[in-house]
Amino acid sequence: VPDQNHVTVIARFTPAADRAPQLRALLEGMIAPTRSEPGCRSYDLYTTETEAPDFVLLERYQDSAALEAHRTTAHYKAYRAQLSDLLAQPVEVSVLRPVNVIG
């Protein structure tokens, strides 16, 4: 039976001019510590196939409590403190709840 309590987050990052390498490094630095969180089901980084690529994080957590726990970690707070200088615009974040999903 699929778990209908999980939470999926899609976060899209548009790097400021000449900041893509630093943004990528910052986002990649979040992968290992986030994946080790007990409530993290997946945490995957993608890039768009556009001339000036954006980065997209596809995150899945066991439930809302796990997402909130993620947002209180030291690595999340350190990442947020460095993020704004690397962006051309604010991060676009969508938090999704399952309606009809497999797994």
Predicted features along the sequence, with ranges:
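Glycine-rich beta-strand-turn "strand-cap" elements at beta-sheet edges
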Residues: V1-V7, L45-P53, A81-G103
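Residues at secondary-structure transition points
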Residues: P2, T14, D18-P21, A52, ...
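N-terminal first-folded block
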Residues: D3-L45
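Short, well-ordered beta-strand segments in beta-rich or mixed alpha/beta enzyme
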Residues: V7-T14, D44-R71, E92
